[in-house]
Amino acid sequence: MKGFPKDIISKFDSYKYTDERGFNAINFEDFKNNISYKESFSKKNVFRGMHVQLPPFAQSKYIQVSNGSIIDFIIPLDSSRNDFGNLYHFEISSAESIYYIPPYCAHGFYAIEDTTFKYICFRY
């Protein structure tokens, strides 16, 4: 990257947390604009969740499985909703769409096979 002006290209270091289940990596965080790009790898039969961020750290997520497959779990935690506390689940495989998780939902997933999972988080 030598010779590139910093206002054209910037390099960011990621932070990876590894354990027996796989890893979680924070690839990019912009605290000023409250956005982060994260990635995880989970071995087959690993469950991650249920995670929820409460105000003032509430966040929405855009999620995508880039390799493998999961069963995704969502629980709405907004008490004004008719479906408050209901558990929703569905399977996501690689190369499928990107899914949106609202900020008032607990979220988790179960890796049906070794899975790489990417997500973009927006804090409110």
Give the predicted meaning of each segment:
Residues 91-113:
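Conserved metal-binding segment of the jelly-roll/cupin
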Residues 1-92, 115-124:
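Non-catalytic, conserved peripheral segments adjacent to functional cores
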